[in-house]
């Protein structure tokens, strides 16, 4: 979708992006605070930011409980979500264009005027515990926090996170919210039709009743080469594997794009060098690789599942093809095919306001710099 993007600095200290998409029938918003797990006051209440996020759409200045708020918010089909990471707590909405201002007001109330209470806290602590218990049946979610710990990241694994839930009290919720949900610590991205409403949106955001606060820095981990991690599960019928190659720097968008092309060559389709060949040999049903880049480090991750009898041959194939890539043994035809595939997927990935907002968020919320969409194909 054709669009233009503008960075906005508000008088209250917040900043973000307004993305004008002429003719859009939907508006998408994303409001993010550096308030994730790494900003919990201490490790004994590590899961606190996650519980704060769960309480985001509960009781507030206008609605007595989550059910009343939900009924009002969704009555015309609007969608909302919230999520927590090591660094961020993020609140997202998507709505029909005709009710953008109503939804923005509801988002303001939920973010700026929550009414935390014991009843909802008790319920959401139980819900978070249930969520984490469910994740413990997902071997990938068991594996990756242990890998993070092995390379020196200051995180807890799922079992450790569950143990901290019982320690969280209402005073902790209120303290974390007051400290982290401030104007200077907020980034926003709003994508949709801006004509005739740009000033109204800016004025509305500047009137959000948030304290100025401070902008938190993203913690930097002292990364190291990690020892191999083994998690034994009696109920596991195969091997779930994962390994990560880490570099201690942020990758700019052009390098991320290049690495995604390499991921496609190695694991993108059944025509790829690792996954495709493994499928052809009957070694693996599914595996892949991906790239993630934060403020101070970047991760090239591989994972999948393999039957025990096929593991040695699969890992040998992975090693062989990765060494070829390291030595520059990539055919021109494979490189051109990866670029062609990437260009098509790039254009397909900008068909909705939410997709466009997510594209800009990937770089902006980490570095607070703007990677123009139209520059990427070059």
Model features per residue range: what roles?
Residues 59-62, 67-215, 220, 249-250, ...:
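Charge-rich, well-structured scaffold segments of protease-associated domains
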Residues 1-68, 164, 174-277, 315:
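His/Glu-rich zincin catalytic helix
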């Amino acid at each position: 979708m054709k669009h233009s993007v503008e960075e906005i600095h508000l008088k209250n200290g917040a900043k973000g992006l307004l993305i004008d998409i002429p003719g859009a029938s939907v508006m998408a918003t994303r409001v993010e605070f550096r308030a994730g797990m790494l900003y919990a006051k201490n490790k004994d209440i590590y899961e606190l930011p996650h519980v704060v996020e769960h309480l985001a759409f509960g009781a507030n200045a206008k609605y007595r409980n989550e059910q009343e708020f939900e009924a009002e918010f969704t009555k015309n089909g609007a969608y909302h979500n919230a999520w927590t990471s090591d660094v961020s707590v993020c609140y997202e909405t998507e709505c029909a264009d005709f009710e953008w201002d109503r939804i923005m007001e509801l988002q303001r109330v939920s973010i700026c005027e929550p009414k935390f209470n014991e009843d909802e806290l008790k319920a959401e602590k139980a819900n978070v515990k249930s969520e984490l218990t469910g994740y413990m049946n997902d071997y990938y979610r068991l594996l990756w926090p242990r890998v993070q710990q092995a390379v020196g990241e200051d995180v807890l694994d799922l079992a450790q996170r569950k143990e901290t839930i019982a320690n969280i009290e209402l005073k902790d919720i209120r303290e974390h919210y007051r400290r982290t949900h401030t104007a200077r610590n907020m980034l926003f991205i709003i994508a949709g039709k801006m004509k005739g409403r740009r000033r109204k949106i800016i004025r509305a955001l500047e009137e959000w009743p948030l304290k100025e606060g401070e902008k938190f820095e993203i913690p930097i981990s002292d990364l190291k080469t990690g020892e191999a991690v083994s998690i034994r599960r009696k109920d596991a019928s195969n091997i779930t594997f994962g390994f990560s190659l880490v570099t201690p720097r942020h990758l700019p968008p052009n390098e991320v794009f290049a690495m995604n092309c390499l991921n496609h060559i190695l694991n993108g389709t059944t025509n790829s060098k690792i996954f495709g060949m493994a499928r052809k040999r009957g070694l693996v049903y599914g595996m892949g690789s991906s790239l993630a880049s934060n403020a101070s480090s970047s991760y090239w991750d591989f994972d999948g599942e393999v039957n025990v009898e096929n593991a040695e041959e699969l890992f040998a194939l992975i090693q062989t093809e990765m060494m070829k890539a390291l030595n520059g043994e990539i055919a021109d035809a494979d490189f051109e095919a990866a670029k062609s595939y990437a260009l098509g997927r790039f254009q397909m990935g900008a068909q909705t306001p939410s997709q466009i907002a997510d594209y800009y968020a990937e770089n902006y919320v980490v570095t607070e710099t703007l990677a123009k969409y139209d520059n990427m194909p070059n």
